[in-house]
Swiss-Prot record:
It catalyses: 1D-myo-inositol hexakisphosphate + H2O = 1D-myo-inositol 1,2,4,5,6-pentakisphosphate + phosphate; 1D-myo-inositol 1,2,4,5,6-pentakisphosphate + H2O = 1D-myo-inositol 1,2,5,6-tetrakisphosphate + phosphate; 1D-myo-inositol 1,2,5,6-tetrakisphosphate + H2O = 1D-myo-inositol 1,2,6-trisphosphate + phosphate; 1D-myo-inositol 1,2,6-trisphosphate + H2O = 1D-myo-inositol 1,2-bisphosphate + phosphate. It comes from Candida albicans (strain SC5314 / ATCC MYA-2876). InterPro entries: Acid_Pase_AS (IPR033379), His_Pase_clade-2 (IPR000560), His_PPase_superfam (IPR029033), Histidine_acid_Pase_euk (IPR016274). The keyword Glycoprotein applies. SUPFAM superfamilies: Phosphoglycerate mutase-like. This is Phytase PHO112. Pfam families: His_Phos_2.
């Protein structure tokens, strides 16, 4: 099996220290390719995107004129449904009559990483977790770094508007981000106003999670991802059970052990379950997850571009709005919502649908690099002389707009970006194509009416 090596920077690598043997210093080794966080499907801690070497600094000769953030919540515990599956497996381990041998020998003195069931679906914090990847702490750091870079846009003694879905963990992330951004000036209702937007279908298009209102998307399902060969799971089950006769471990259980590895890292900083699999098995499982997400939340689903048009159109309108006194737009939602937005935007869209009969190398759609825990999309509006430009930073890496990257810092002129958006979603009618109830709001307005309308949906898990 792969021994997950820990480096000084707490990187978790699917390789041994031999990767350094033929180079003079560790700095010469390309170890990022082995980082286990690449292979855990976005369930594990945040990981920066592998970019193109383009500096994320504001380009010389330009000023930042507006910044938009669309962020996923931070690292969390497994959901209640995930937790139920993991507990069922743990019950099998606890009820096993015998001493565990082989790769599972650690189970002889192992304790389940979720000590309190009320933590399911919650964001990890220093209070409820033991590791270094607390979601609240990472959100705090993110907010502070964001202020350091874009603080010139923030008007002192003003009220910072923040837009968050009414998921408890999403709201929690937004709060800690705001604390990091505002520091000692943080005061709810005075220096920051949280606009809590319902995730329910009845808010229609006036939502950070418009997928809820798209009834036709709920009717749509793709069986494409199910064609992927998962016989490797049988081999894992056989390998683990062989020295432990009588243990009933199904392929579904094995698949869930990959998630166990990821979520335990969120809570404890590491997991012995990560050592159960080979390098190839991590890659195979990761691609299976990429397929599932691509054909449900990505461009493989014909409705995602339609749903994503709601946020993308609003983003474009904000970029064009020069009269608004606020130029710092902070929005928080879920991985599904960010992935759907990406489907509309198209920067990370593969040239062809993902194949199910083989793993393409390089893989053009790695879910963990698109929406890891704490994922973030920055939309920068740059003012360079008399011209305005748009640039995207996705998970801390500049991702140029296809065929529109000749501006400073590989940005795209705002007028050209508007044409790009029209080409992507100009033919979309969210209300009609999604079958949205005619009594629901037909457009997103909260970015413009939040000062006069109260958005305070009750928090839910």
């Amino acid at each position: 099996m792969v021994s997950v090596s820990k480096l000084i920077n707490n990187g978790l690598l699917l390789t041994s220290q031999s990767v350094f043997q033929d180079v003079a210093t560790p700095q010469q080794a390309s170890v990022q390719q082995y980082n286990i966080l690449n292979f855990l499907g976005g369930s594990a801690p945040y990981i920066q995107r592998n970019g193109y070497g383009i500096s994320t600094d504001i380009p010389a000769g330009c000023e930042i004129a507006q910044i938009q953030l669309y962020s996923r919540h931070g690292e969390r515990y497994p959901s209640k449904s995930n937790g139920k599956s993991l507990e069922a497996i743990y019950a099998k381990f606890k009820n096993y009559n015998g001493t565990f041998k082989g790769d599972l020998s650690f189970l002889n003195d192992y304790t389940y990483f979720v000590k309190d069931q009320s933590n399911y679906a919650k964001e990890t914090s220093p209070k409820n977790s033991e590791g270094t990847y607390a979601g609240t702490t990472n959100a705090l750091r993110h907010g502070a770094a964001f202020r350091a870079k874009y603080g010139s846009l923030y008007k002192e003694n003003s009220t910072l508007p923040i837009f968050t879905s009414n998921s408890n963990r999403v709201h929690e992330t937004s709060k800690y981000f705001a604390r990091g951004f505002l520091g000692d000036d943080y005061e709810e209702g005075k220096t920051v106003k949280f606009n809590i937007i319902s995730e329910d279908a009845d808010v229609g298009a006036n939502s950070l999670t418009p997928r809820s209102a798209c009834s036709k998307n709920k009717e749509s399902s793709s069986s494409t991802a199910k064609k992927y060969n998962t016989t490797y799971l049988n081999a894992i089950a056989e390998r683990l059970v062989k020295p432990n006769p009588g243990l009933n471990l199904t392929t579904s259980d094995v698949n869930n052990l990959f998630s166990w590895c990821a979520y335990e890292i969120n809570v404890r900083g590491s997991s012995p379950f990560c050592d159960l699999f080979t390098n190839e098995e991590f890659i195979k499982n990761s691609y299976g997850n990429d397929l599932s997400k691509y054909y449900s939340n990505g461009a493989g689903n014909n409705y995602t571009r339609i749903i994503g048009s709601v946020i993308l159109n609003s983003s474009l309108e904000l970029l064009k709005d020069t009269e608004n006194s606020n130029q710092v737009w902070l929005s928080f939602a879920h991985d599904t919502d960010l992935e759907i937005f990406h489907s509309a935007l198209g920067l990370l869209e593969p040239a062809e649908d993902l194949p199910t009969s083989y793993i393409p190398f390089p893989n053009p759609y790695v879910h963990s690099s698109i929406v890891p825990q704490g994922a973030r999309i920055y939309t920068e509006k740059l003012q360079c002389g008399n011209d305005a430009y748009v640039r995207y930073i996705i998970n801390d890496a500049v991702v140029p707009i296809p065929k529109c990257a000749t501006g400073p810092g590989f940005s795209c002129k705002l007028d050209d970006f508007e044409n790009f958006v029209k080409e992507r979603i100009g033919d979309v009618d969210f209300i009609k194509q999604c079958g949205v109830n005619s009594t629901y709001p037909s457009e997103l307005t909260f970015y413009w009416d939040y000062k006069n309308v109260t958005y305070n949906a009750p928090l839910e898990l």
